Amino acid sequence: MKMNVYQEISQIIKEADGILIGASNGLSIAEGYNIFADDAWFQENMGDFREKYGLRCILHGFSVPMKVEEKWAFVSRLVKAKAMQDEPSEIMKNIYALVKDKEYFVVTSNAEDHFVPAGFEADRVFEMEGKLTQMRCKNRCHDEVYPNQKAVLAMTEEEVNGRVPKELLPKCPKCGGDMEVNWGAMSSFTETKNWKEKAARYQEFIQNLHGKKLVILEFGIGWRNQMIKAPLMQLAAVEPQARYITFNKGEIYIPEEIKEKSIGVDGNLTVALKEIRKGRID
């Protein structure tokens, strides 16, 4: 009996020597987190900042100048709500279930840090634009990042009228200056030692899978994306046994040169992942 597209993908993953996952904003949106939207969540949780500064989305909030005690109030609310979830989403659980028994690596521009809590090994996840759950010295006096969850909880508990008490503001352990969240949306974002180590592991993974059955799973990446999508498409083109599978609601882009080794899945990601996990023949 002929397989449907979900069964075909399930079989391709089963036969893979390694899985390379690429993920961007479309995956976040499928989980209910949209940094570009003036949606109900943003209006309810950031309404005071929205009114005071004319903000229209999360990303806008990172670009508008604020006093440090206000900026950390904005950031700590966001981190607690979107990057410190009690339970991984069904989507993330299903993605992990597909690859957990394989050699895998994740490259993502998403900063909400949802991969590791879902079971992915931290050393196999390269967050190209940093993580909301990390902070670093704003003065860049040294090249280290630090977890910020403990500080975030303290700040959200004591925030008053959109400001964090000055005594709770994170300070650099080296120079005593202000800390800031380690995310690419910050104009001062730079590549850290940790970033460079992850980048090296990414290239090592690709080299180790050269000539083997590499499956590229791409989640929520727009066709213009040069950071992740373009390199993944190029990799699919040069690797003879590679398969390229892209999931993106409302927009599927597959170049002609890799069309024969590719599959595009439009529509509801939650449904697609459930069906692929089943791997059943109807």
Regions found by a protein language model. Give the residues of each.
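Conserved catalytic alpha/beta core of Sir2/sirtuin-type deacylases, generalized to analogous enzyme cores
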Residues: 1-282
